[in-house]
């Protein structure tokens, strides 16, 4: 995927790597990868984006892949880099979507770039830790034990977290070389997620992403974990642009309590709940199509409902 690599220099002098997919003249959507991840996270059948008239732009969040690290970054700092990419490409208005650990960063863009973001989507996104209605026990409830361990390492600080993540990354590289579907073998995933991991599309993206996401070390992963469990730097109740919240009821990586909290607290949001899906969705091509159609045109996904603060 080296031919896809593009870079820019941010106003503070960092290198930021990104890639473009689909209809390069289409409606721009900036997609923010999960934790960990990189710019290669996307649906591998690029024609889907072109058919929808969407120009999908992915980037390596600071510290991942080919992007320079930004130590001490907060979730609220991600809009700086999203704005830099949009300015570089001449996008005045655009959609933003983020999945899993990218979800909070998409919400940050919705909150802090209201003059640029048309609509945003938070897909199986993490909720803020320790907020009213979602204390630490509730935030951790239902999470796989492997996830809980990672949270505890992050709470202990970078000195504990970094070597543990480095060991996990080395293990992931070994597994992906043998069989990408085993990358999450230590997790007690739902049947839906186990089935998704075994699909050719998912295995392709897992292989590409893991080989690329930590070429410069695990600094991006470390910084994501620390940012997500810390105060985000903004409140979701200031969001004024339309937001789609989607979550699955069998998710053990970001349990449904997170989606429920976001649905109850993000003003004016649309909510799509999948009773079968876990973290990886039940029909990714259909779900991505619905999500991008909504981001680009405002057509609501089937069976979505207005949140309580609509």
Q: Predicted regions span which residues?
A:
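Conserved HGGG/HGGXW glycine-rich cap/lid loop of the alpha/beta-hydrolase fold
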Residues: 14-66
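Catalytic active-site module of serine/aspartate enzymes centered on a nucleophile-bearing elbow/loop
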Residues: 268-310
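N-terminal cap/lid segment of alpha/beta-hydrolase-fold proteins
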Residues: 1-20
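Conserved hydrolase catalytic core segment
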Residues: 92-138
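Short beta-strand/loop motif that positions the catalytic acidic residue
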Residues: 239, 245-247, 251
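Alpha/beta-hydrolase
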Residues: 140-234
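Conserved alpha/beta-hydrolase "acid-adjacent" motif
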Residues: 252-258
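Conserved acidic catalytic loop of the alpha/beta-hydrolase fold
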Residues: 77-95
């Amino acid at each position: 995927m080296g031919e896809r690599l593009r870079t820019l220099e941010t106003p503070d002098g960092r290198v930021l790597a990104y890639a473009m997919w689909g209809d390069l003249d289409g409606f721009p959507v900036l997609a923010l990868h999960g934790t960990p991840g990189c710019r290669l996270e996307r649906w591998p059948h690029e024609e889907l984006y072109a058919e929808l008239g969407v120009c999908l732009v992915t980037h390596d969040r600071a510290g991942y892949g080919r992007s320079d690290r930004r130590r001490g970054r907060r979730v609220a700092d991600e809009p700086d880099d999203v704005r830099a990419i949009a300015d570089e490409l001449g996008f005045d208005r655009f959609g933003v979507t983020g999945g899993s650990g990218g979800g909070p960063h998409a919400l940050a863009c919705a909150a802090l770039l209201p003059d640029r973001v048309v609509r945003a989507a938070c897909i199986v996104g993490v909720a803020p830790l320790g907020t009213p209605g979602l204390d630490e026990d509730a935030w951790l409830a239902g999470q796989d034990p492997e996830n809980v361990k990672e949270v505890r390492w992050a709470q202990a600080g970078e000195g504990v977290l970094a070597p543990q993540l480095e060991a996990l990354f080395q293990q992931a590289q070994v597994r992906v070389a043998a069989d990408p579907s085993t990358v999450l073998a230590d997790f007690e995933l739902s049947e839906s997620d186990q089935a998704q991991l075994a699909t050719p599309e998912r295995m392709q993206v897992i292989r590409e992403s893991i080989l690329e996401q930590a070429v410069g070390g695990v600094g991006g992963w470390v910084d994501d974990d620390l940012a997500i469990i810390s105060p985000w730097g903004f409140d979701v109740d200031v969001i004024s642009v339309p937001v789609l919240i989607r979550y699955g009821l069998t998710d053990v990586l970001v349990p449904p309590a997170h989606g429920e909290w976001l649905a109850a607290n993000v003003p004016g949001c649309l909510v799509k709940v999948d009773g079968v899906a876990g973290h990886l969705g039940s029909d990714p091509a259909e779900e991505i199509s619905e999500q991008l159609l909504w981001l680009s045109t405002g057509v609501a996904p089937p069976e979505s409902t207005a949140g309580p603060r609509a």
